[in-house]
Amino acid sequence: LLMLNALAEGKEVIISRGEQVEIGGSFRIPDVIKKSGCKMIEVGTTNKTHLQDYENEITPITGAILVAHTSNYKVMGFTESVKLSELSALAKKKKIPLILDLGSGAIADFQKLGLPHEPTVQSYLKSGASVVSFSGDKLLGGPQAGIICGKKTLIRKIHKNPLYRALRCDKFTYAILEATLRTYLTPIDIQKENLTMTLFNRSQAELLKIGKKIVKKLPRKIVDKFGIEVEQTEVEAGSGSLPLEKFPSAAFVFNGEMKASELGRKFRSAPNPVLGYISDNCFHIDLKAIPATQEKQLLSSLISILQ
């Protein structure tokens, strides 16, 4: 919204039909473009868009080319999209900015951290994007915020837009974001200090061991009454990130007489709420989302909620 309003207000913004994404809260790219004061020009088809499609729609009133990275879904099969380097060359030729909404955003090489590959912000900037926006939470592991980086001249223009003052973060958000970014200084810091990366990297064997240890400490009557078992599971990153990837995990599975929906409400309404999910008509509490510092609290919550 801020990028488009600052760089292309009153002009046309070109975007591929296959990139008109919807994010959480039913916010859609076409609505954001309209709200920013721009007119959306869609090109290509849902599964295929070519460079010529973009070039054919560029006019004197074109304000920008927008690329929205589909971080919360993937189109597979008979598909084709334009390389960012080619779009960058076209945008430079026509003297219009190339704006990239990266969505979740990654600033580290995930494969070096033992995680699935995800293109980095740096790689998109090197490929020629004029400005790139991404989330401060999700894959980055920080506070909920939007981050914009790119060419200095365009960033200055965005910074001077009145919307910037209305949308700027508070000091607490900046402080948390700074602390999060400092964890990326070395690979060791990321794995030890960044909670998101720590949770991603906990192995299934480790989680199974933790789960069984907690179950042993529960009163036997609670375990029997609620049919609590520790089982292997697969989980997703969530927050619209890495949509095709599954992460091996382990969970408490409740297979007792109480209905899964009722059990879920019981946990959510507790003084210290515990959020789980329902799968195969059983309530699950997945250990992939439980930091090591909260394992004792989880045990206490299980006892107080179920006794």
Which residues does each predicted region cover?
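Conserved PLP-enzyme active-site core in the AAT-like
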Residues: 1-184
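Conserved PLP-dependent catalytic core of the aminotransferase class-I/II
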Residues: 15, 173-174, 178-238
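Long alpha-helical, hydrophobic tracts
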Residues: 21-23, 27, 299-307
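Structural alpha-beta junctions
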Residues: 90-97, 219-226, 307
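Short acidic (Asp/Glu) and glycine-rich catalytic loops that position anionic groups and cofactors
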Residues: 103-104, 153-159, 186-196, 243-248, ...
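A common structural junction motif
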Residues: 165-166, 268-275, 304-307
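Short, amphipathic alpha-helical "lid/cap" segments that border enzyme active or binding sites
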Residues: 174, 178, 295-299, 303
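Conserved C-terminal alpha-helix-loop-beta "cap" of PLP-dependent enzymes
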Residues: 208-293, 298
